[in-house]
């Protein structure tokens, strides 16, 4: 379905935009996001479309840089045992609102995924959409990818094709699969899905 000013209706769920009344209330009383968790990014919709017909059957998934949690909550409805992870504590009220709108109880964790303290052992699959903003993080992502591949885990990354994303792929020695995916509704989105690991 098409987007309204305040909502996106997609794959059977309601996703608030920055114009949603509850989002406006949160922005008035909440701290400013210091990362990029200030909206639902387009690559999230691409992954939602990709996973729409899959029953995850309690698969343990980590949604890295989850922001408002649209993907986390959507996959909870699809049967995943998913945790939304973000380094910005200020996205938590937005994540809670998303849970309320989608009628789910999805786990949320504040964590720097590049820290040695981040325990990857509970998860089989890691998702990351629209996270490649800065070249300064390229080495950190490569280290993280190497870490999970050695543990026979996988990362599914989605990005519209930023220069920093291509730089990451150029510098990463690990094999990967890449797919270009497009949707025309509720927004016109063109992104690249990259899969590291089996």
Locations of the language-model features?
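S-adenosylmethionine-dependent methyltransferases
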Residues: 1-198
